[in-house]
Amino acid sequence: DVVVAVGGGSVIDTAKCATLLKTNDGPLPEYEVNTPEDVTAGSIENHTHPLITIPTTAGTGSEVDYWAVITAPDREFKMAIGQPPLYPDGPYLGADVSLVDPELTASLPPRQTAATGFDAFSHALENHVAAGAPELVKPYTRHVMGLVPEHLPDAYETGAMEAREQLLFGSHMAGFCENFAGFGAIHSLAEVTGGMYPEIPHGEAIAVFTPPVMRYNLEEYPARYAEVATAMGIDTSGLSDTEAAHEAVGAVEALIDEVDLPTSLEELGVDEDDLPTIAEKSLETIEIHDNPRDADAAALLEVAQDAY
């Protein structure tokens, strides 16, 4: 009658794809989306099987978004699968009901708490600065960018339920925002790296790429990252947009350090010789199309080298 997904983003994404293939024909790669045109093509023709999602991590927001990420081992690539409703009552990839209870995250170990919590922050960050990000999401993305730095250290260090509740609320809110705004080079590079090195937790790859991508993008869009600084509670009075944007990068790096997340690809065990491939394959992802600053393979290689 219904699929019930209890777990983190990988569990929920797997369940989403199971509900898709229950009611639609073809192998899963036929539903991969790599460009905005792939999304609007409407490859999901039939309503998916009913799905209830129950997240046990505060990170991906997959319980309420229209997307799934599935690794194709033969390609060493993380496929994006997804579709919003393209017309009233149209088919989409996602849950019918989501049950969100912070007590279900109580046993999440510190390392996973840090990685998934930072992933939630990165969703709000990239949704906020994305090319074409609608204004309607920005009150929510601002709130999450303030909420996660406030509560993630406590959740990581003590596991306090109040902190976990706030993180789950932030993750859930950011998940909604994902349905209206895109991501960017952080997720492109991190997902490609995770496809090539499946042992690397997604949130840790996200943490490594976030400051370098911020530095790259703020060169052309400092005002957007100045807003990130304000959202994180930084006093930007008297600062130029560029100065405020660099303060935001510093605050993000401080958060990463505070919860002991990795700070380099070398620390994650990535071979430096793989950086050109990571840059090239990132151009095949759906997320790169919403990066605020244009990026080709050479630019992404520079970002990856900065992350190394």
PLM segments and residue spans:
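Short, amphipathic C-terminal "tail helix"
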Residues: D271-Y308
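A glycine/threonine-rich phosphate-anchoring loop and its flanking beta-alpha core
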Residues: T23-A133, A226-E227
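Glycine-rich phosphate/pyrophosphate-binding beta-alpha loops
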Residues: G59, H172-G203, T285-H289
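C-terminal and late-domain segments of enzyme folds
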Residues: P109-M173
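N-terminal small/polar loop signature for handling phosphorylated ligands or for N-terminal nucleophile
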Residues: D1-P29, P153-R164
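Short glycine/serine/threonine-rich phosphate/pyrophosphate-binding segments
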Residues: S10-K16, T60-V64, I186
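Gly/Pro-rich interdomain helix-loop hinge
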Residues: M196-E199, G203-D274
